[in-house]
């Protein structure tokens, strides 16, 4: 399903803890699966692994997340809040993070876990980031929404 924001696919899971989605330990670092042998996506893709039941992340609110990020090209982790032992907070829709995060976290509910695949144009583009993320890299994140204020 395409939209003007470039989202081509949104998959929804059943609510957390239901019979079709086993209760996960949301206080553990998730695995991030990066497709192998497939070309990278050029659209934002959102896959809800767990649908939260709490407050919704909307533009203008401050969100608190835990996340793991990997590069599509090599499957290597480049960042994870879990490894630092602290969550990350930012103002949603305020341009404090890459566009793919602003668009990808919006609509999540507290307690949710979402895989967000971000094309270069919504990530770091041709410049890359700090020698850790290469130019024109597609990024794959698993994000847990911890809180909304």
Where in this protein do the model-derived segments appear?
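Intrinsically disordered, low-complexity segments enriched in small polar residues
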Residues: 3-7, 17-18
């Amino acid at each position: 399903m395409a939209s003007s924001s470039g989202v081509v696919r949104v998959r929804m899971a059943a609510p957390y803890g239901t019979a079709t989605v086993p209760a996960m330990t949301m206080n553990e670092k998730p695995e991030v699966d990066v497709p192998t042998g497939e070309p990278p996506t050029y659209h934002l893709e959102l896959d809800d692994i767990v649908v939260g039941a709490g407050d919704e992340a909307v533009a203008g609110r401050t969100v608190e997340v835990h996340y793991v990020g990997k590069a599509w090209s090599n499957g290597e982790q480049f960042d994870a809040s879990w490894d630092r032992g602290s969550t990350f907070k930012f103002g949603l829709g305020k341009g404090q993070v890459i566009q793919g995060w602003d668009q990808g976290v919006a609509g999540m509910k507290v307690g949710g876990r979402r895989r967000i695949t971000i094309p270069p144009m919504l990530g770091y583009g041709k410049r890359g980031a700090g020698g850790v993320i290469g130019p024109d890299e597609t990024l794959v994140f698993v994000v847990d929404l911890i809180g909304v204020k």
